[in-house]
Each structure stands twice: as structure tokens, then as C-alpha cells.
Amino acid sequence: MRYLTLIAVFWQVLNCSAYTHSGNPTASGVYPKVGMAAADHLPFGAKVTLPDGTVVVIRDRMGGNYTDKLDLFKETEDECWQFGRRNLLCKIEIPS
């Protein structure tokens, strides 16, 4: 038997920012680490590719019901400040 996995792929300009450790697990129940991100409008497990080729997986929520924001997890507060806030054209892959 063969299975066909469908993946929705689209591009969206996202307002990107960064966050770091709070000591608490993410909304999906796992503890945050580099390579994870928060978004209200994308399902857990969706992959987002940034323009520099970095791929992050949605594992958290922002809590504001935003449809155009992405919050990237960084190891330190300094890395968050260095990243700042950017509007980036991102590739989004949503698994079936």
C-alpha cells in the first residue's frame, strides 16, 4: 500500500522577532531550543524557511491571535536584541 503525503507550501511576509528562555515549556509541551519558533496562525510542526536558509519548526504560540508574526527562539537575550524585528519573506510548509 502506498501513501501520499500532502504538504501545503506557500510564501508569506512575516514580522519576525526573537525570544529566549523563560524556564517554562512551550504551548506544545516541549522546552524551547534553537530551531523552534512561535506563531499563532500556523499549526505545530509547520516548517518555516527564512531567507538565509534557516529552517525553524513551529512549537509555540504568541498568544495574540496574530496572522503575520513569527517569534524565533534564541539562546540568549543578547542574540534576541541583535536580531531585532524584521519583515521577512518566508517559505512555509504545512504537513498533512
Task: List each model region and its residues.
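Solvent-exposed, well-ordered loop and adjacent helix/strand elements within mature globular domains
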Residues: 2-96
